[in-house]
Amino acid sequence: MCSVSELLDMENFQGDLTDVVRGIGGHVLSPETPPSNIWPLPLSHPTPSPSDLNINPFGDPFVSMDDPLLQELNSITNSGYFSTVGDNNNNIHNNNGFLVPKVFEEDHIKSQCSIFPRIRISHSNIIHDSSPCNSPAMSAHVVAAAAAASPRGIINVDTNSPRNCLLVDGTTFSSQIQISSPRNLGLKRRKSQAKKVVCIPAPAAMNSRSSGEVVPSDLWAWRKYGQKPIKGSPFPRGYYRCSSSKGCSARKQVERSRTDPNMLVITYTSEHNHPWPIQRNALAGSTRSSTSSSSNPNPSKPSTANVNSSSIGSQNTIYLPSSTTPPPTLSSSAIKDERGDDMELENVDDDDDNQIAPYRPELHDHQHQPDDFFADLEELEGDSLSMLLSHGCGGDGKDKTTASDGISNFFGWSGDNNYNNYDDQDSRSL
């Protein structure tokens, strides 16, 4: 049977952990009951002494460590949320005669350090710890351990400010670790290449019709592998690569300035990985045509004849579609170079959205000869001499005379003079 006092006490329960402990213990506080007879609760095992806590017989570093959950509960009791044994009697009567003592004694707490640190991570990738402790004895070990854990991180150790404590072999040390996130490695390689822009006056065009791209000589051998139209400019942009060395990654772009068309804007990308070429190799590519034309401004007639004969010979060697002999095939290295240039031209990093047209030389119309070139020509008839001699050599002398007269007239001989000479010779012989 429950007494009346117990029923009155149950009405004053607040439904917290203290009411559960009070109900299990069955202790009802009254003004006559001294508080020291109730709390603290008897422990199931004796409290070890501080000297026993430092003993580590089996080499286990977790023997002398406390439970972090118990430490959290102890901090709650220290905050004043629960009343303790040392409260005044006025507070006891105001709380309907009940006493909520301290749950855990301070003898169980060795220090405020814990193996489980409380970490606060900020947006600046700095890891802060919130428990107050300062022991700079093992700061060097912190740097070595953190550097081995994160080789890309930046580690800063602050031994002057109180930080969270980590227990290693019975000693404590504090640290502040700052880990920087690695840089974004997904950027394009072309972005990291250094570019150099040079503005020079555009040289005069060699022919009367000025084109948008006149490349000056810069003592390097360049080869053009493409061009691209520019928005807002009537002149295209040319793309060149170094042809002095096969593995050279040097590139340049040549275009007219949008503000001043008389200026050329040359953008150099990457550096040459080879020495300066000799003068003969430097004339390769776009420079060779300009120097050759300037060195021989007035060609003579024999050179023109040689050019005509060479052009005729080249026309004779053109392989028509109807011919049975296949044309000579290109080498595999030349094909690979052309494919590499096309792929590189497609990967050019530029803001324009126009399509890049690869550079290809145009074929002239005279090189394509039709098959019916000799169709309008007629075959020659029989020989004219056979026609003249077809009258026959037999018959009277009159026919022979007319035939001989026809032959003499054909070769421009006079028949009368010949006959007169023959008569004179006969008379002299007689």
From Swiss-Prot:
Predominant location: nucleus
Region (Disordered): 283-366
Keywords: DNA-binding, Nucleus, Transcription, Transcription regulation
Bias kind Acidic residues: ranges: 340-354
GO terms for MF: DNA-binding transcription factor activity; sequence-specific DNA binding
Domain of life: Eukaryota
Gene3D superfamilies in the cross-refs: WRKY domain
GO terms for cellular component: nucleus
Comp. bias intervals (Low complexity): 286-306
Regions recorded as binding DNA: 211-277
Compartments reported by the entry: Nucleus
Entry's transmembrane regions: none
Functional note: Transcription factor. Interacts specifically with the W box (5'-(T)TGAC[CT]-3'), a frequently occurring elicitor-responsive cis-acting element.
Family note: Belongs to the WRKY group II-e family.
Protein name per Swiss-Prot or TrEMBL: Probable WRKY transcription factor 14
UniProt gene name: WRKY14
